[in-house]
Amino acid sequence: MQVIKLLPIFAVANDKQKPTIFTLYGYRFMFYSNDHEPIHVHAIKGNSRAKFDLFPTVALVSSSGVKAHELRLLEQIVVENREHIIEQWLIYFNSDRRYERN
């Protein structure tokens, strides 16, 4: 798996409506500025999209235009970066929400 350097969201966010957490394999892992709980992440590349919930564990919610092998890769990336994604969500939404670390 490709190694990524995780940056604070404000260091890589170039679109205030769609804050980017990181990009990998051409996918932009992000959320929308008006997103809602449960905490989740969107992976977007062109017209390919997938959405993963992070609680209680990582789970695919929806996808469009993503091949099965890419979905497995995206899920693995989200699992491996779950803590960072949650941390960035809480920072961005200025939340002191507590959550169970799995």
Show where each model-derived region lies:
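Compositionally biased, intrinsically disordered low-complexity segments enriched
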Residues: 4, 38, 42-44, 83, ...
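Short, positively charged and aromatic/hydrophobic N-terminal segments
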Residues: 5-9
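N-terminal first-folded block
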Residues: 10-43
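Generic preference for hydrophobic/aromatic residues in regular secondary structure cores
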Residues: 21, 59-63, 81, 98
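Aromatic side chains
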Residues: 27-32, 52, 89-93
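A short, structured beta-strand/loop element
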Residues: 32-68
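C-terminal structural segments of small proteins and small subunits
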Residues: 72-102
